């Protein structure tokens, strides 16, 4: 049952609701877990409550062992790991540059073993939280918990890989990019 719920919630997150043409191909027992809202289908709350959704995020411009470690640790805190990948516009606002586009970075993260869903961040953190509805938010060792919603467990990882700090900016500097 839990695997079916995870599958349906993942579909819902990737597409902003499950489209009618996808809904009709789902087995009847899975269709019964969904409610129609404005022409799209969403997991009913009584089923959503049966899984623990973990949200984490980052830029993920040059993937390295520190990212993998953080994602593996985040996954341990729930059933479904959702990773918000920072948008290009968000990064530009912080006066930073990326090597890879937001779409490329999201696709790379989506293929990592611990990740169930990778999606682009939203302009406002509140909108992302409303969209994902996490039970847990995990921040990496080098991230400051900037949002702590009521009723959501917030975890800050302190563990680093082999005591070393892996930073994309240091890797870029070493590569001379």
Where are these regions (language model features)?
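Nucleotidyltransferase catalytic core that binds NTPs
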Residues: 1-177
């Amino acid at each position: 049952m839990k695997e079916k719920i995870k599958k349906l919630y993942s579909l819902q997150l990737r597409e902003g609701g499950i489209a009618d043409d996808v809904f009709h191909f789902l087995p009847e027992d899975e269709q019964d877990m969904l409610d129609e809202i404005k022409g799209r289908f969403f997991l009913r709350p009584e089923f959503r409550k049966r899984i623990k959704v973990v949200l984490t995020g980052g830029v993920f411009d040059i993937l390295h062992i520190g990212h993998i470690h953080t994602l593996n640790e985040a996954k341990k805190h729930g059933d479904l790991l959702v990773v918000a990948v920072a948008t290009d516009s968000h990064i530009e606002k912080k006066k930073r540059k990326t090597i890879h586009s937001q779409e490329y970075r999201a696709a790379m993260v989506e293929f990592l073993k611990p990740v169930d869903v990778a999606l682009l961040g939203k302009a406002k953190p509140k909108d992302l939280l409303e969209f994902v509805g996490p039970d847990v938010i995990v921040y990496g060792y080098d991230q400051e918990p900037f949002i702590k919603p009521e009723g959501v467990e917030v975890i800050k990882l302190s563990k680093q890989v082999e005591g070393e700090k892996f930073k994309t900016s240091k890797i870029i500097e070493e590569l001379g990019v």
